[in-house]
Structures are given as structure tokens and as C-alpha cells.
């Protein structure tokens, strides 16, 4: 072992076996400990200050881990795991990291008992597969029987640990209305909820309960000129990804003029090129022009004369969303394949009304009743920028949860109910296995209890007592068919006792639970498979050679 841990012929260090495994487990546990205290409805927030002094205050696991500058490769795996969970599901980022770290810790104990990592990996895969099957067969609640209340309760459960949890009813209703507003049916006839098309704007000032849901797409811009019309009915929208400014010749172009009068003609032609472009756009019937670039005063005059509304400096992501909602095509150039410039009427989008209104304290442009898809916008108010940013993250998580519930039409009880039920089931399942996987499945079952345990600790309750009571209820539910309704029992963290979370309305999307189990298991297995770490030294600029000499000195080339 000592020989292996010396310098290598490749200018690096190698460590293997138990050393690497211990390092990986420690790194994973460190990452999990950072986010552990932010789990649950009474979890605490983290303040992160980056290298230039920007402050972020958040409770969101994915945001915390994204802002950490982690060096250890095993810790990076967990940070990427939280990012993956956030991208795929949108919620459950903290719990997925905690479960993965606990699985690793317990697998390390098995390795120390001389059980081969391959046996543990096999057991973990089997346990994960059984756990997902058990959730789908026994623990899901169909949302059709619960209706809108189920959606609101799922959103409230997601918000409960966040800054907007205190006004959960208000924001949950707003989020459900926003998600329902953007519903459309795809080609297969299935309902889809593209929550990315919901624009979330932030304005600091006033209280968070003065946030509003706006019917239509709210654009944080104003018309280009005061003389323009502020309202257009039956709007035909042109989405342009270039500037409408006086054309100037590129640098390096040289024009030799013998007659001074020709200079004015060149200037006139520069103006005419842009004028012709605007006329081509207006000739198609366009009366609302949105562009990501600038529009100079000369061009604005043409739009004012034509009675059209022109908006400049629109963000590209907003332009793409508006194009999708209105049925427009984003145009990045007017040039066609023949080298001519043209603009087709088919590239225009349509909306019932485009109007500039004063919403809260700001002037916004609202695009209402778009033709291709409906759209909605949420305008958040808060005391300061930190609060508004955290509210936006919380709304994003809640929107993702509502989308998942609407699309999958199933939820599971929250508050540690699923983890406790799976723990009891997998312990019993492990005893039916005759192979070495039995120990790994039992450790998997024990690892899941970290979620109810952490929830209780964060709520300043007696974790040992609460988790023991919870396990007793779930054991009774699985052993005694007459009392199977006890499977909905989870933790009431405010009063510090178990309760029926189905009646209490504490719900989470089934997808959050199943995906987090799968992702956590795969991440733990990825790190568990590692038994060798070779770390190369960064190459210094002044030391070009030296590899061979270092290798001879270390004895790595001796037989």
C-alpha cells in the first residue's frame, strides 16, 4: 500500500483501496451536512457570499450546492446530482443528496466488514427497484379523487420550508392558476404544462402578499417612443433578432468619391436601406414589432407614422417565449437565399390585444390572449432583492411540483411517510433474500430513515422517539391488513407527533420520490465503484521536463 501511495511516473499521486473510499465517504458526508439543516418545513436558510461579495440567502438545496466551489471529485458528483434532480423534477434536491450520502456511509461500513462492493451494488440496485415498485403499487394516491385541493396542498408542501411558506395558501392558489393557464394539448392528445413559458418578474417594495398573477405575457419593457400608441387590438406581432438602426458600412470598407455631392447620396442610401426594411415589415400588416436590438429615432418615426407599436431591447428568452405563444417565427435576418431581403406575413404571430399598462409601480407591456398558446405571468413583490430572488426560486419549485402532479396524476404522502414505509418493507424483504445482498438491502432500508430523522431534528423534536413511533405504525399497517390505512401516517413537525398526512393534505408528487431514490442510488453506486484515485499535479510553466527524473528518484521504474 505504501508503495502505491508514492509519486508516480506521471507527475501525480495515487491512492487506492480503503484510503480512497474513506475520502469519498467523508466528502459526501460533508456536502450532505451542509444542506441537512435546510430540510423540511422548519429547515433553516443558508447565507452564501461569493468571491466578489454577492450575497445569496436561500433554502434551496440545488442553489446552495451550485454556489459552492467544490474541489473533491466525489463531492462534485453530489453537487451535480442536486442539479440533475432540479432539472428533471424541480423539487427534492436536498433529500436526494442526504439519501445518497447516507447510502455511501452505510455501504462503507459493509466494506469494512469485508463484503465486496459488487455485492453491495447488486443489493442497492435490487432494493431501489423494489422500493419504486412498492411506491407505485401501495403508496400512491390518485389526484382525480382529490381534485384542485390536491394541487394546492402539493404546492403548499413544497413551499412550507421556503420564505413564502407563511403565505402558503395565497401563493399555492396563484401557482396552480398559473400552471393551469399555460395548459395545451400536444400532438398525441396529452395535456402539457410548459411552466417555462410562465414569466416571473420581480419588483422590490411592498409586501409579498401584494404579488399578482397577470393573464397574458408581461414584458418588462416599454414602447420605444412616447408618441406611439399604447394599445393595439388584434395585434400582428413581428419578432426580430436584429437592430433596426441606420445602416453603416462595415469597418475596412473604402469608398473613393470624386464628386462631393455623391457623399450625400451614400448617406441617403444608408437611410433608405433601413427604411425599405421597415416598409417590408409593415407591408405584411405587422403592427407590433419586438426586437432584441436597438431602434434609432429615424426608424421610430416611421413606426409612429404607421400607428404601430415598437419595443426595443427585448430579452432573447422573452422573444422566444412570445414567438412560441403567438405562433410567430423569430427572424434573425431579412436576407433570403437569393440575396434579396424579404419578410413574409406567415412569420407574424397573433394576439387579441397588446397594451402598455402600469402594474404595481412599473410600466409593463402585456400581450393578452395569444393565438398559439395561452400565457401567464407572475409579478413578485418583496422587501428587498434577496427576498425576491428566494421567492422566485420557491415559486419555480412549486410550479415544477404542480406540473408533475398534473401530468402524472398521482401523489404520495409527505412528512417521512414514504421513507418509513419503505424502510419496514425492505427490512422484511431483505430477510427473504438468501444471498449476500441481504445485508446491502437492510442497509438501504436503514439509510432511508435519515429523512424522517433529519426532519425531526430540524424541528427540534425528539428524533429517536418520533421515528420509532412512525416505524411502529408502518409495521402495523404492513402486518395487519385491517389497519392498512396507517400507511398514510407521517410526521407532524409542528406538534411533534405522527399523524395521517393524507387527511392533513401533506402531498408530494410520486415522481419526486421515485426519481430521488433512483438518482441517489445511482450516485452512491458511482462513488462506491471507485477504488483508485490518481491525481495529477498541475504542470508548472518553468518546469517543462522532470518526469523521468522524478520517476527514477521515487523508484517507480525499478524492478
From Swiss-Prot:
Enzyme Commission designation: 3.6.1.-
Top class in the EC scheme: hydrolase
Molecular functions per Gene Ontology: ATP binding; ATP hydrolysis activity; ATP-dependent protein folding chaperone; unfolded protein binding
CDD domains: TCP1_alpha
Residues that hold ATP according to the record: 40, 92-94
Binding site for ADP: 40, 92-95, 161-162, 415, 508
Subunit structure: Component of the chaperonin-containing T-complex (TRiC), a hexadecamer composed of two identical back-to-back stacked rings enclosing a protein folding chamber. Each ring is made up of eight different subunits: TCP1/CCT1, CCT2, CCT3, CCT4, CCT5, CCT6A/CCT6, CCT7, CCT8.
Protein name as it appears in the record: T-complex protein 1 subunit alpha
Gene: TCP1
